[in-house]
């Protein structure tokens, strides 16, 4: 069975301790678009519940978390372990596919794009960079899978 022919909906997530950027793509076009940010909650369980409501609302079939792999293998961040825990919680709550995707430097790339290409001020960039980073993460994932 060709997986690209099935109805698919992807949620890209750029996790941050304060804000979580979101992007969405669905078949047949699978074009990732930023859909905004959600505020991180006081616990990972509450954050997972907030994300699960978006997952259900948009009938998401696959969640793609940006996984900030360290540039040096010996270093692992606390954010990385939070992402792994949050991904596991979402998978338990929804039983859908949750993928951790290498997102090294996606936030920096998003910030550069917004600064140079859009002419946004610092506050505007701050509000847009997380969802743009999620869009870059989801785009990278979809490109690698050639799902379009």
Curated annotation (Swiss-Prot):
Keywords: Cytoplasm, Hydrolase, Nuclease, Ribosome biogenesis. Its EC number is 3.1.-.-. Coiled coil: none annotated. It comes from the Bacteria. GO terms for cellular component: cytosol. GO terms for biological process: rRNA 5'-end processing. It is found in: Cytoplasm. HAMAP family: Nuclease_YqgF. Belongs to the YqgF nuclease family. This is Putative pre-16S rRNA nuclease.
């Amino acid at each position: 069975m060709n997986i690209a022919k099935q109805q698919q909906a992807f949620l890209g997530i750029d996790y941050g301790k304060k804000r979580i950027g979101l992007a969405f793509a669905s078949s047949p076009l699978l074009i990732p678009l930023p859909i905004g940010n959600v505020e991180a909650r006081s616990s990972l369980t509450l954050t997972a519940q907030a994300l699960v409501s978006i997952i259900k609302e948009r009938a998401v079939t696959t969640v793609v978390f940006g996984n900030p792999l360290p540039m040096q293998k010996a270093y692992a961040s606390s954010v990385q372990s939070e992402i792994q825990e949050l991904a596991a919680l979402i998978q338990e709550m929804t039983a859908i596919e949750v993928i951790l995707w290498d997102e090294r430097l996606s936030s920096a790339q998003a910030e550069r794009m917004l600064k140079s290409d859009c002419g946004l001020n610092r506050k505007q960039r701050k509000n847009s960079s997380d969802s743009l980073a999620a869009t870059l993460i989801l785009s990278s994932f979809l490109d690698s899978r050639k799902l379009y």
